[in-house]
Amino acid sequence: MAVYTDITEDELAGFLAAYDVGTLTSYKGIAEGVENSNFLLHTTRGSYILTLYEKRVNADDLPFFLGLMHHLAERGLSCPLPLPRADGALLGTLSGRPAAVISFLEGMWLRKPEAQHCREVGRALASMHEAGEGFALTRANALSVGGWRPLWRNSEARADEVQDGLKEDIAAELAYLEDHWPRNLPQGVIHADLFPDNVFFLGDRLSGLIDFYFACNDFLAYDIAVCLNSWCFEKNGSYNITKGMALLSGYESVRKLTAEEVSALPLLARGSALRFFLTRLYDWLMTPAGALVVKKDPLEYLTKLRFHRAVVSSAEYGLRRDEASQ
């Protein structure tokens, strides 16, 4: 469910008067997504997305998110483009919520991605990293290594309710990652949440990237680790090296990884798995019964985390380069 704030047609028409989008002909709520209220708009000029930003999104971050999408789209990345109001602002107010009108992106997300799609994702991710260069605003990654311990404290006492021994296991993992986390890797703007439902395809062609509301500044290779975790594991928990090889080769067709990034990838993948495990664990334990949130099983990411612990080299992810030569 992704409509938390209802709007009337008169309210919407008044709001749209500040935009050069024509006259409203129809609108409907969009069911996917959990952070904001989203509506599909049809006007005499075409189709658009209206987003009302709910309380879970920090309003202070909105200039970064909207400015980044505008920056990336101007540089040729296929992503939603926030439309300016008559006064030039990208953000307005509707029903007491910050709101934006964004271009409509054709396509659908894939429920069963294959290796060819992973290659396209890798290529698009690298293109996004390059397009993000020069973006003036910055935003720290609140869900990187510095944010994991506070998140863990919220769930630690009840962790063994999910699996026996989990509290001790995750405490040790967190301590290890805090001690060994990389410090000097190439940085830039990252998406940080490029799961399959945030990538649109038309047939087998990638048509665009969406949902930049976790975007931030961090290690570029961390974004790759997020994608390895979200695109390259099968439902039975096994890692598909064919998909990993495709994703990594797609990325490197645009931007080559440094030797330091190659060496750090197993550690970054562990960290990415822990990050999504911790947020899922929190939601699993703390979401009230009856809340309009679909809880996701945290153990899926525990399985991935344990896989990464055993990885010795990035070659095990499908990176087919001589690390020593980089």
Swiss-Prot record:
Q: Which EC numbers characterise this protein's activity in its record?
A: 2.7.1.39
Name the catalysed reactions.
L-homoserine + ATP = O-phospho-L-homoserine + ADP + H(+)
Q: Which residues form the signal peptide?
A: none
A Gene Ontology BP annotation from the UniProt entry: threonine biosynthetic process
Q: In which pathway does it act?
A: Amino-acid biosynthesis; L-threonine biosynthesis; L-threonine from L-aspartate: step 4/5
* InterPro entries reported for this sequence: Aminoglycoside_PTrfase (IPR002575), Homoserine_kinase_II (IPR005280), Kinase-like_dom_sf (IPR011009), Pseudomonas-type_ThrB (IPR050249)
Per UniProt, the keywords (alphabetical) are: Amino-acid biosynthesis, ATP-binding, Kinase, Nucleotide-binding, Threonine biosynthesis, Transferase
Q: Name one GO molecular function term.
A: ATP binding
The domain of life is: Bacteria
A Pfam family annotated for this UniProt entry: APH
Q: Gene3D superfamilies, alphabetically? A: 3.90.1200.10, Phosphorylase Kinase, domain 1
Say yes or no: keyword Nucleotide-binding present.
yes
Q: What class of enzyme is it?
A: transferase
Record-stated family? Belongs to the pseudomonas-type ThrB family.
Protein name as catalogued:
Homoserine kinase
Q: What is the lineage of its organism?
A: Bacteria, Pseudomonadati, Pseudomonadota, Alphaproteobacteria, Hyphomicrobiales
